[in-house]
Structures are given as C-alpha cells and as structure tokens.
A protein has these predicted regions:
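C-terminal-of-GTPase-core extension/linker across diverse P-loop GTPases
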Residues: 2-217, 222-228
Length: 228
C-alpha cells in the first residue's frame, strides 16, 4: 500500500485499485483471517492474485490417523474427534474440506501390487488409498480434470481445466494439435473398460466424434484428429 500511495495520488488507476484493496485487506489479515475469506469482486480478486499471498491460495487439510482409526472416524476415539474438529474448522473458516489418510497404511500400500493393495484396503473397510483421495480432492479444489490417450505403446493421462473444450485439451499435448484441430474421437474410460477394447466399444456405439465446442469430461479417452 505504501509503495503505491504516491502513484495513486498522481492518478494512476492501477495503483489506486491496489491501494484500495490493500487498505481493505490489511485489517482483515490483522484480525487473523486468511485472505481467501475476504469477500471481493472479480476485479479485486484479479488484483489479489498479483499480491501472491499464501493465505489467498485454495486450501485443503490432510489429517493423518493411525491404521485402527481409519475405518472408525465416526467413533469416540481421540483421532476421530480431531478429524471432526478439523473438518468443522475447515468448513466454517475456509469453506474447504479435509482428507483423512494414514501414513502408516500408505507406506504399506506402496510395497504391494495393485490387486493385493485393493484387497488390503477392502480388509480395512475403505475403498481407496489416502493418496488417491488426496489427489482427487486437490484436483476438484483446483478445478482440474484428467483425460486419457492410449496407443500400442503407452497410455497417458493429461491434466486440463474444468470446462476446457477439445482444441484446448489437445493443445496440452502439443500446440499443433490445437492449431490444426479437426475433431476428437471420444469414449469414456468406463465404457472402454466394460467393452474390453476400442473395436468392441465401436461396435457397441460407445465411440463418437466431437467437434470444437465439445467440453472434455473427466475420464474421457480421446484420439485427436488434426491437420497442420
């Protein structure tokens, strides 16, 4: 605020806007509140991003509990009470969530093959690993989505923003894909797995061609057609 005061007094509109926001923000921070919870207009949010404040970043809590507590988070154990308290605080003060993981279990899972890991989790009464839950929660918080490409040699996942249309999603692979975009062949991951192969998915009518306005969905398996 002090740095821009002189420029603001000389009529610099950008400096005036930054000073005005700083004057609104400082008492909020002095009260021990994170910048994320300050109600701002769209233009103010844009300015705030330029301040690079840690407390303006999206927030997600991770609670580490013991192996025996993971399947009994509704109980009266000390760990369960702490988890509920963190979740309540996160919701009330930051409007965010909390993911529960067990570092002990994650360490054991890292040494197991996928099928054994799945059986191990089932025996604990949980469906997914803590790391998997943490990744999905972070993606949701940041507005990110994943689509897949597959071929004879490899299958790859690509990260895009929610709402990205097919050309923009193609550009994540290479700018030429976006520049010369023609169409995208789409099949959902679930349909592809259920059918067993791309050929059978085509026979079942699960493959379709989409154009430039198609919004790529989480879990889409995509083959781009382009020409440059």
């Amino acid at each position: 605020a002090e740095r821009n005061q002189k420029a603001a007094r000389s009529g610099d509109k950008e400096a005036k806007a930054e000073v005005a926001l700083a004057e609104k923000l400082i008492p909020h921070l002095d009260a021990g509140k994170p910048a994320l919870t300050l109600e701002l207009g769209d233009s103010e949010k844009e300015i705030l991003r330029g301040f690079f404040l840690l407390t303006s970043k999206p927030t997600l809590f991770a609670c580490n509990v013991g192996e025996n507590d993971l399947a009994n988070l509704e109980g009266d154990s000390t760990a369960a009470k702490h988890v509920r308290a963190v979740r309540q605080y996160a919701a009330d003060h930051l409007g965010c969530g909390a993911v529960v993981i067990s570092a002990q279990i994650e360490s054991e899972l890292a040494d197991l093959p996928p099928e054994e890991a799945k059986e191990f989790l089932a025996g604990l009464g949980v469906e997914d690993s803590g790391v998997g839950q943490l990744i999905r929660a972070a993606y949701h918080l940041l507005g990110l989505r994943t689509y897949l490409t597959t071929g004879p040699k490899e299958t790859r996942a690509w990260t895009i923003h929610a709402g990205d249309k097919a050309p923009a999603a193609a550009g994540v692979i290479h700018s030429d894909f976006e520049r010369g975009f023609i169409a995208a062949q789409i099949v959902s991951f679930e349909d592809l797995v259920a059918c067993g192969s791309e050929a059978k998915a085509r026979e079942a009518g699960k493959l379709r061609l989409e154009g430039k306005e198609y919004v790529v969905q989480d879990g889409d398996v995509v083959e781009f057609r382009f020409n440059v």
